[in-house]
């Protein structure tokens, strides 16, 4: 991690996210409440992921790192050492995936496996970090193929299915319960892709729509897993 990126991460670390709860059986915290994996702020998560996406496509890596710190902290609620380590892994996975067509999916997958291994150390899940990483990078693949496809996609396309598989595995939920979240996420990606095609204008009216689609994604996901 460069000195500049360390400074960005340190600034981003100021108070993001609630304290970590100790997980109990079946994804529940010790007091019978849903674990931190199943209890999150959809608006906050959506805002941070939106910043990651915009920074990624503009290749503004310090912005990606800063938003990733908040995203990992808010999404997983791990201690700060694991949060900063996890955010760095997210950044590296994105950097390794970004080039087209000569990216490095194997190394990107390895970074995500290490991230999910940190989550497992904190909460005991996902059971298989390598499988979680494979499912994560698989939706990246599906999205990239969609970006370069000549035919428009439908509502039951491979991208929606790949995100559904990831959510179902991470939270141990039936795929039917998390599919709506995947549909909204795919819609956010559609809007992001259109924004890119139109020149990545910072004042584009597509950006608020993309942000709103991510909020709907995480609201639907919370409704499915918060128990």
Where in this protein do the model-derived segments appear?
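Amphipathic alpha-helical repeat scaffolds
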Residues: 49-54, 94
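Hydrophobic/aromatic side-chain positions at a characteristic register within alpha-helices
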Residues: 56, 97-100
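Extended amphipathic alpha-helical interaction segments
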Residues: 112-194, 198
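Short, charge-rich amphipathic alpha-helical segments embedded
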Residues: 70-94
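A cross-kingdom marker for long, charged
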Residues: 39, 201-227
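Generic helix N-cap/helix-start motif at coil->alpha-helix transitions
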Residues: 41-49
């Amino acid at each position: 991690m460069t000195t500049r990126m360390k400074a960005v991460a340190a600034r981003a670390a100021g108070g993001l996210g609630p304290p970590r709860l100790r997980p109990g059986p079946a994804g529940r915290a010790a007091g019978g409440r849903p674990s931190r994996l199943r209890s999150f702020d959809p608006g906050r998560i959506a805002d941070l992921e939106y910043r990651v996406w915009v920074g990624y496509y503009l290749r503004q890596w310090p912005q990606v790192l800063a938003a990733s710190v908040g995203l990992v902290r808010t999404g997983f609620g791990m201690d700060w050492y694991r949060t900063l380590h996890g955010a760095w892994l997210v950044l590296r996975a994105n950097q390794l995936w970004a080039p087209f067509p000569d990216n490095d999916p194997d190394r990107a997958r390895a970074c995500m496996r290490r991230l999910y291994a940190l989550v497992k150390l904190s909460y005991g899940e996902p059971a298989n970090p390598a499988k979680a990483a494979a499912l994560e990078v698989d939706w990246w693949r599906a999205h990239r193929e969609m970006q370069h496809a000549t035919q428009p996609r439908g509502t039951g396309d491979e991208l929606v299915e790949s995100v559904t598989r990831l959510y179902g595995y991470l939270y141990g939920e039936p795929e039917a319960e998390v599919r709506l979240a995947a549909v909204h996420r795919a819609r956010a990606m559609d809007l992001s892709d259109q924004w890119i095609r139109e020149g990545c204008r910072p004042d584009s009216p597509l950006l608020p729509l993309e942000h709103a689609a991510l909020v709907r994604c995480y609201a639907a996901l919370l409704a499915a897993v918060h128990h």
